[in-house]
Regions:
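Membrane-proximal helix-turn-helix segments that form the acceptor-binding/catalytic region
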Residues: 70, 130-166
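N-terminal strand-loop element at the rim of the active site
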Residues: 5-13, 19-20, 26-64, 172
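Short His-centered aromatic/hydrophobic patch
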Residues: 86-93, 112-115
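Structural alpha-helical scaffold elements that stabilize or flank donor/cofactor-binding regions
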Residues: 75-77, 158-159
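Generic beta-sheet signal
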Residues: 59, 111-113, 169
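Proline-aspartate-enriched helix->loop->beta-strand connector
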Residues: 80-82
Length: 172
């Protein structure tokens, strides 16, 4: 089986990155092919933690560009990818990009690392609401927070409805 991981920032420091490294190496040891595609590769020196057979592929911003879609589609076809594991499972953009697999036999699994009812985006918006004292600004920041909460909900709904499996990894 050939597996492609997709994540925004890899290789990098962090929990999702460690999980991706461990899984990629395990899949290689089990005889599978593994590619990790990412938009940013800030700590390429961490690639030494991967077994030599794991391939790294760099994509570019904007995430959903035609260039990225074509590159990912070519990878799926040329490398005979069976499964994409989308490790960046919250923003709808990642699932939208990975939907290039829709025109192939490749299956898409999206993973949400964290609580489904919040995100960094919402936490920052809540912090802003709590630290402002001006009533007008407080109203504006609450409206912005509401819109961000709705965006996160819509992203999760989109992701759940456009992949074969949606995995939630959360302690909440």
């Amino acid at each position: 089986m050939n597996i492609l991981f997709f994540y925004r920032v890899y290789p990098n420091y962090g929990g999702v990155e460690v999980v991706t490294t461990v899984l990629a190496n395990r899949f290689i040891k089990d005889g599978h092919g593994v590619i990790i595609a990412s938009i940013e590769q800030p700590h390429i020196e961490l690639a030494c933690q991967l077994l030599p057979d794991v391939k790294l592929v760099k994509l570019d911003y904007p995430v959903c560009s035609i260039k990225n879609m074509r590159k990912l589609h070519r990878l799926i076809i040329n490398e005979k990818i069976d499964i994409i594991i989308n490790q960046w499972g919250l923003p709808f953009m990642s699932t939208l990009l990975c939907r290039v697999a829709k025109r192939t036999s490749c299956k898409l699994i999206s993973v949400l690392h964290g609580a489904p009812n919040t995100s960094k985006l919402i936490i920052k918006a809540r912090d802003k609401c709590e630290t402002v004292y001006n009533p007008f600004l407080k109203y504006i920041y609450h409206a912005i927070m509401y819109l961000k909460e709705e965006l996160v909900k819509a992203s999760i709904r989109y992701n759940c409805s456009h992949c074969e499996k949606y995995v939630l990894l959360s302690s909440h």
